[in-house]
Regions:
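P-loop NTPase motor module signature
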Residues: 1-312
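Extended, charged helical/alpha-beta scaffold domains that provide interaction surfaces
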Residues: 304, 309, 315-319, 323-420
Length: 420
């Protein structure tokens, strides 16, 4: 290996920032000839020049056709799906036959709502409506990328951020940008990361706009006003500043870097969050008081999952119920399979659908394979296969006591209230 490329570095993913910091520390000693390249069409060059003054800057104009940009403000009480429909009616119907219109939406919920509305719209009866997001199986993703047949005038592709930079979609002449993105954010009260809907950055908007000019001249409709454009951030904040510190700390422990205070970060993780994460991992028995991996922590680090989910899986393995543990880990790491079904919050009800749910079943199967690499479990009996106890082992902060005389209201062990 002579070069390590960090593509789409403007996204500032936490894994990319961590890998860059580790390489910048190790390369001068172990591989001074190793080249590190940060790539993107929308890099924050002024900031990177300040942080990496020795770095050489290479710029390439590439090939891109002109893209005409329009702004469309939302009308009073106009839902996002109706904004998308209005933009399509105004701009898509005059496109050449077989063209594609790529609609950027923040997530699956918005994609499904738009698909429902557009499928019933009279103006789009001869248009194929396709969806594209990261939870789709690969064959379904590939199907969304195909040109429409002669029976359709064109294709509307309702996409998440996966279409921003990861793939090329043929025949796209129109981009409709909702201006919204999902941003990863850690909630210390739950001990889990979640996705928050936020206005997308100008760098993201420029990436999306460029999709309309890959193969021919195109148009981009932004569903916000020029005034709102001025208030948007230039770049998204680095994930490292908002992410769960526990997986990062486990990586640093394997590296022998402690809290990472001496690493050459571009943006160092917040020290308060790192200290809290360190305390949590020590309480879970994954790190020793000196910050090194415990025997359980070393075993868990081979699984490649979140520390809490890995601990749940190891606990299940020790009790002889590995499949149950992997089913639970899959449920806790993927979208709720019963979302929108008025199914309450019962974990057992969700366990019953794992094997029928394609994404969850495949994820659980992968986790079971990872557990098998550790060798046979200590016991093969299944006498204590209790889902709640397994989850509690990984998330002790979720233990709650019902408040006297207040059905459905609980007091969590750390003192916060909860409503079921």
């Amino acid at each position: 290996v002579s070069c390590v490329l960090f593509d789409e570095f403007h996204e500032r993913r936490k894994d990319a920032d961590l890998a860059l910091a580790l390489l910048r520390e190790a390369a001068p000693v172990l591989r001074p000839d190793l080249a590190l390249v940060l790539m993107s069409a929308t890099l924050d060059l002024s900031d990177l020049r300040d942080r990496l003054p020795q770095a050489e800057v290479l710029e390439s104009a590439g090939r891109c056709y002109p893209v005409e940009t329009h702004h469309q403000r939302a009308r009073e009480n106009e839902s996002l799906p109706r904004q998308v429909l209005r933009a399509l009616e105004n701009h898509a119907l005059t496109l050449p036959h077989g063209s594609g219109a790529l609609v950027f939406l923040p997530g699956l919920r918005e994609i499904e709502r738009c698909r429902t509305l557009l499928s019933d719209a009279n103006a789009l009866q001869r248009w194929r409506i396709a969806i594209l997001h990261g939870q789709l199986p690969l064959d379904s993703q590939s199907a969304a990328l195909h040109r429409c047949g002669p029976e359709h005038d064109g294709t509307v592709i309702l996409a998440s951020g996966i279409a921003e930079s990861s793939i090329t979609i043929d025949a796209v002449r129109l981009v409709i940008d909702s201006g919204l993105s999902r941003q990863l954010r850690y909630d210390p009260n739950t001990g889990m990361e979640g996705l928050e809907t936020v206005p997308s950055s100008l760098a993201s908007a420029e990436q999306r706009r460029g999709r309309a000019g890959r193969q021919s001249a195109g148009q981009c409709v932004r569903l916000w006003s020029p005034a709102e454009q001025q208030r948007r951030p230039n770049f998204s904040p680095p994930e490292l500043l908002l992410a769960d510190p526990q997986p990062i700390l486990m990586e640093l422990a394997q590296w022998g870097a402690g809290l990472g205070n001496d690493l050459p970060w571009l943006d160092a993780p917040p020290q308060a969050a790192m200290q809290e994460g360190l305390s949590d991992l020590q309480a879970l028995g994954l790190l020793q008081p000196n910050g090194q991996l415990s025997p359980t922590g070393r075993q868990l680090s081979t699984l490649g999952v979140h520390p809490r989910l890995g601990l749940l899986m190891l606990e299940a393995r020790g009790r002889g119920c590995s499949k149950l543990g992997c089913d639970l880990a899959a449920l806790l790491s993927e979208r709720d399979p019963l979302a929108g079904c008025d199914a309450g919050c019962d974990l057992e009800a969700r366990l019953t659908v794992v094997d029928q749910h394609r994404t969850l079943h495949e994820r659980s199967r992968q986790l079971q394979q990872q557990l098998k690499r550790l060798g046979p479990p200590a016991t093969k009996n299944n006498h204590s296969a209790n889902a709640a106890e397994l989850v509690l082992r990984a998330f002790p902060q979720w233990l709650a006591q019902e408040r006297p005389g207040q059905p459905g209201r609980y007091l969590l062990r750390q003192g916060r209230g909860a409503v079921l």
